[in-house]
């Protein structure tokens, strides 16, 4: 029966390349799913991707297996999802950081990153003693630029004479998982006088926050 089918449907979550223990975006999703399982007694399927090609494969595999809903973490799932979702009209899909797909069985979850970052910028601007603050982004995409722009606007709101140094880690998905590069960028920013750093960089942010702690400056993290 229909009700039996719904009762048996198991949700699935597909983590992005950082993996579910990235101390950031994916791990937050995993902890939320785990909490759901603990509170309801339910179970969920999961997979950690090893490479880009697996996105569509994992989506199709879970959909074929009857998983419902299928949740994805990250904008890189937009293209594979736009191909797969129409083939499984009875499956519900949800994807974080994608809000431009108009498909009846897809729920996009987007955020006003610039607004929260504006408040973060105000904090940074008020806390800085040098008048120089910095930002480390992960992959250079519009989403992360929204973080950076909101932050800079917030800094300027409390200190119009402040300097904001902004760096992106890279232009490929590897930029989310490069704590060594995050550390190097932070050291360079500190050498230019930055005494508050804001990271919106996934696993790369671990390197930013650790370096800030080691060097004795303030840091602000997000998505973790």
Q: Predicted regions span which residues?
A:
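Gram-negative bacterial Sec-dependent N-terminal signal peptides
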Residues: 1-7
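A residue-level marker of the well-folded mature domains of exported/periplasmic proteins
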Residues: 7-224
């Amino acid at each position: 029966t229909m009700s039996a089918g719904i009762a048996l449907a198991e949700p699935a979550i597909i983590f992005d390349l950082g993996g579910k223990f990235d101390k950031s975006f994916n791990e937050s999703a995993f902890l939320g799913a785990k909490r759901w399982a603990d509170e309801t007694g339910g179970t969920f399927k999961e997979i950690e991707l090893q490479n880009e090609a697996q996105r569509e494969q994992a989506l199709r595999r879970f959909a074929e297996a009857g998983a419902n809903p299928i949740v994805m973490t990250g904008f890189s799932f937009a293209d594979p999802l736009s191909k797969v979702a129409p083939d499984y009209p009875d499956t519900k899909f949800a994807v974080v950081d994608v809000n431009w797909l108009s498909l009846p069985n897809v729920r996009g979850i987007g955020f006003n990153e610039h607004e929260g970052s504006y408040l973060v910028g105000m904090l940074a601007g008020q806390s800085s003693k040098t008048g120089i603050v910095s930002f480390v982004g992960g992959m250079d995409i519009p989403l992360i630029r929204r973080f950076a722009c909101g932050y800079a606007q917030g800094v300027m709101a409390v200190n119009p004479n402040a300097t904001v140094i902004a760096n992106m880690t890279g232009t490929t998905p590897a930029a989310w998982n490069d704590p060594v590069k995050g550390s190097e960028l932070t050291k360079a920013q500190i050498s230019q006088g930055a005494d508050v750093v804001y990271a919106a960089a996934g696993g790369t942010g671990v390197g930013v926050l650790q370096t800030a702690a080691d060097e004795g400056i303030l840091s602000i993290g997000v998505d973790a």
